[in-house]
């Protein structure tokens, strides 16, 4: 089991009876003062960017998470959750943003026209190197031409961790096996197909020789201008309004236990999982008054 520092900190806090009300988030990219901020859960992305000095380009794209495995946010008004660890602002015309916004239909068309089956994506795939039965070049062939009757080629989508090595580093034709796998995985899940791959893998000998150099990855993604320090700001940012989402984790959507107009204290329970369901409790990250209850619990902080 691998635990990051913040997870260990939250475990220690739980042992002291303290719930998770804050999260440490690195805000970087097109911002004036890149920083690692301690944000109250439910802080809007707009407030987080403002705390880093504001954005330095017009109408930026915001990546929630890291640049490789993160996702584009639909609205900068969206709240920070317990699992938010990074916010990366990039120009809307940045090559990596264009890659992330590319529809899967385009990826499929490109698979037909541009994939030369060089298998570079499969040679560098971390999951394949760990011994899993996955070969990204085969899904490109199958999706593009439907030339396989082997169900394992399709169910290998369950083995894809969507790490992004294939499309951000390996492929010289700017194709995205990851996006194709993501689409296949969603279709299999919608059809009720379960992951059939249960074998314990044996890592390949080539694993130690095929690791991706961080510097080269940054260069390939065009992120060199944004490589700089993001110093930790220890003080908690408590905005005027927070919106605590009722679903921030795997499992069921939590049920609110507070009502509009109710006064809550920082750390007070505001939502919990339904009975006999897997989920997580959520707590007020500021002291104030509940102003709305829906998919989120909105709290206006006391002055």
Protein language model features and the residues they cover:
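Hydrophobic alpha-helical positions that pack around
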Residues: 1-43, 51-58, 66-67, 75, ...
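Active-site loop ensemble at the mouth of alpha/beta enzyme cores that anchors a bound cofactor
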Residues: 1-5, 75-106
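Ferredoxin-type iron-sulfur electron-transfer modules in oxidoreductases and energy-metabolism complexes
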Residues: 90-112, 122, 127-204, 239, ...
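Short, Lys/Arg- and Gly-enriched loop/turn segments at beta-strand edges
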Residues: 95-99, 271-285
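N-terminal, Lys/Arg-enriched amphipathic/low-complexity engagement segments
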Residues: 203-252, 256-257
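Short histidine-centered loop motifs in beta-beta connectors
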Residues: 254-263, 267
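Short hydrophobic beta/alpha edge segments that flank linear recognition/processing sites
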Residues: 265-279, 296-299
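Conserved hydrophobic positions within beta-strands
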Residues: 288-290
């Amino acid at each position: 089991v691998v635990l990051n520092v913040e997870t260990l900190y939250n475990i220690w806090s739980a042992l002291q009876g303290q719930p998770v009300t804050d999260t440490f988030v690195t805000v970087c990219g097109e911002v004036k003062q890149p920083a690692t901020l301690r944000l109250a859960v439910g802080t809007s992305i707009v407030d987080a960017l403002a705390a880093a000095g504001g954005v330095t380009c017009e109408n930026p794209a915001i990546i929630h998470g890291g640049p490789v495995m993160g996702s584009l946010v639909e609205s900068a008004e969206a709240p920070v959750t317990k699992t938010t660890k990074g916010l990366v602002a990039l120009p809307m015309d940045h090559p990596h943003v264009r890659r992330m916004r590319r529809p899967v239909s385009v990826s499929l068309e490109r698979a037909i026209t541009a994939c030369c089956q060089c298998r570079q994506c499969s040679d560098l795939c971390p999951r394949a190197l760990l011994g899993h039965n996955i070969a990204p070049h085969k899904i490109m062939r199958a999706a593009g031409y439907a030339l396989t009757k082997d169900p394992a080629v399709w169910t290998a989508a369950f083995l894809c961790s969507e790490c992004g090595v294939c499309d951000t580093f390996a492929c010289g034709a700017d194709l995205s096996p990851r996006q194709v796998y993501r689409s296949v995985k969603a279709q299999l899940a919608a059809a009720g197909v379960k992951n059939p791959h249960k074998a314990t893998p044996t890592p390949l000998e080539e694993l130690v020789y095929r690791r991706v150099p961080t510097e080269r990855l940054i260069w390939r993604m065009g992120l060199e201008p944004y490589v700089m320090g993001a110093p930790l700001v220890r003080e908690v940012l408590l905005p005027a309004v927070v919106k605590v989402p009722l679903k921030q984790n795997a499992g069921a959507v939590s049920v609110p236990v507070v009502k509009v107009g109710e006064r809550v204290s920082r750390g007070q329970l505001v939502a919990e999982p339904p009975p006999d369901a897997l989920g997580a409790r959520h707590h007020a990250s500021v002291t104030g008054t509940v102003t709305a209850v829906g998919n989120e619990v909105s709290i206006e902080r006391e002055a």
